[in-house]
Amino acid sequence: MLKKTMTTVDFGGTERTEDYYFNLTRAEIMEMELTTEGGLVQMINRITAAQSQLELAKLFKQIICKSYGVLSPDGRKFIKNDAVLADFMSTQAYSDLYYKLASNGEAAAAF
């Protein structure tokens, strides 16, 4: 589980500092591996070797979207669904994170 504390300025001009959570379970990683031609690692190696910005941008979005969720109040569940993802993607935090990953190799590698 990756917890990212991000400070953003929302669309109303209010500065907000909030925690955002990202996690891929072993099952989700396995599914990505098995449903990617040649495997996930080979695909990442191919994209980085070709320095394909288009494919890299698609990969960042896929990873963000598959890993974002919210913790249940009791901490037992990590909730990921279309509504949770749509809510996050409509924030400035999503925009800032995507931009940072797409434009900063070190940030992308750390994520």
Enumerate the language-model features and the residues they cover.
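Short, charged/polar N-terminal "headpieces" of proteins
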Residues: 1-42
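Acidic, aromatic-enriched beta-alpha/helix-loop junctions
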Residues: 28-62
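Generic structural signal for hydrophobic core residues of well-folded globular domains
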Residues: 47, 67-68, 101
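Short, structured surface segments that line ligand/substrate-binding pockets
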Residues: 53, 58-78
